[in-house]
Amino acid sequence: AIIGKINILIAKGYLDSAQVLVDKQKMILNKFQSHSSKKNLLNKLNYKGTQILFYKGNYNEMNLSLDSLIQEIELQNENCNDLLEIKTISLFFNQDQEDFKKYSAIQHKIQMNKSFESLLELIQLMDTENMLINELAQFQYAIIELEKGNIENAQKIISSMNQKTIFYELSLIINAEIEDHINKNYEIAIKLYEQFIEEYPNSIYKENILKRLNKIYKLLMKDLDL
């Protein structure tokens, strides 16, 4: 229930109030040393605290909190992947902390369902000379457009990415999946999947793509039999 209240405050933009609630609950928990689920609850509260620091754009504080939490939690923890993803992204901004403030503000606006403002600010972030930040902004813009149903625009943005970053790699997969699952253009999807495997033969996504290609081939063979 407490985590839910904190989430509501964050979603409404009340980051300071959310932090006060996090700190208050941590103080209460620390009084009950024998509490059976104390560690789990503390990790959840620390996760929320780290999230608040992220949304506030406090780069150094957020990283310290993030590193501490990553060391504390187990790999099976529900927030582990999110924390590792945030850590990876934060490294892109090591020399561009002003851009980190912009990026974190955008993420908070997305959390508050302010997609129009988010898109405008992502466009501004694309002007950066940092290649990773540039393609991160493009990639996120494309994802928002995709979620809004603006498929063609999403594909245009994806097609403009060519810097061979992790986001370029992911964009190739998304473009193939759009043709595959949304447009049902299986022949185009096959070409895009095969292009991906050719460019990234050692990708962690290769096995799943090969499985999907096999299913598409079977679908096309079934259509030919009909």
What kind of region is each of these model predictions?
Residues 1-226:
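Acidic, polar-rich low-complexity tracts and alpha-helical solenoid repeat scaffolds
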